Amino acid sequence: MLRPVSVITVTNGGYFFVRLLVEKVREFIGQREYEILVIDRGSRDGTLEWLKQQPDVVLIKKRQWGRRHDHGEAAELGVKKARYEAIALLDSDAHPMQADWLSLTVDKLDERVRLAGATFRDKHEGNPHGWYVHPHFMTFLKSDLEKLIILRKMRGHTTDTGEEATIRVLEKGYEILNYPLEFCAQFAVGHPRVPTVSAGVFHAWYVTRLFKETATVDRETGGAVTRENYMHPLQELLRKTYKLNY
C-alpha cells in the first residue's frame, strides 16, 4: 500500500498557478490516499472561490499581517492540520510533472531519511552547509515538526524560509535526499535559469512576488523577470502545452 500524503501549499493570489497545482497533484498522485491543504493569506483574484468548490481541498484562511504571520508560519499551520503523517510541501507556483515525484521523496522517508526534496545552493550566513532543501518542494514527516522540521525563520535574515529544517536534520545526524535543481527547458521563455524542475516537480519561481512585490523583483533581477517578459509568456506556454482553458 502506498503511503498516504498530505499535500500543503500557501497561497496569496495566483489563481492560474494554484489551480494548475491542484489539477496536476490529482493527475500524478497515483493510487494513494491524499488531501490537499491550502493555507490562504488573502487571495482576492478568484482563487478562494475556486478552491471552495474542490472536494479534495481543505481550505484554511490565515490573513497576512505583521510578525509571526509569514509564509513559514502559514506552512507550519498546514502541517499541524494535516491528516496524514507524510507531508509534501509545494509552493503555489509549483506542480508535479512526473508520476514518480512522490516515490522519489515521500516514499523514501524512514528512520534515517527525514527530509527529501529540491536542493537550492547558496551561501547564507546562518547555514554552514551552503545548500538546503527548498520549501517549493519539501517532503518530511508530520511528527518531526518543531523537532527536526521548522519552516519559519529562526535566524533572522541569515537564513531563508524552510532552511532551518535542513540545518536541524543534519545536526541531529539524520540523512537528506536532496535532488538537484535543473533548468526546465520544456517551459523556457527566455530566462536562462528559470523555471526549474527537481525530482519531477516544476517550479516557476517569482510568481507570488510578481503579484505583491513587482518593483522589488524588477530591481533584483535587473528587469529580467517581469509579468510581461516572464510570467505572462510562461502562462501562455503552460496553457498551450497542457491544453488549459483558464
Task: Please state what every model-predicted region is.
Residues 97-167:
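Conserved catalytic core of nucleotide-sugar-dependent glycosyltransferases
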Residues 159-246:
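C-terminal catalytic/acceptor-binding lobe
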Residues 24-33:
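Short, acidic, metal-binding catalytic loop of nucleotide-sugar glycosyltransferases
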Residues 1-23:
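N-proximal low-complexity "stem/linker" segments adjacent to membrane-targeting elements
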Residues 40-48:
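A conserved acidic beta->alpha catalytic loop
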Residues 64-81:
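Glycine-rich, basic loop-to-helix element that forms the pyrophosphate-binding segment
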Residues 87:
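Short aromatic/hydrophobic "clamp" motif used to bind/position activated sugar donors
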Residues 52-69:
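Conserved donor nucleotide-binding strand/loop of the catalytic core
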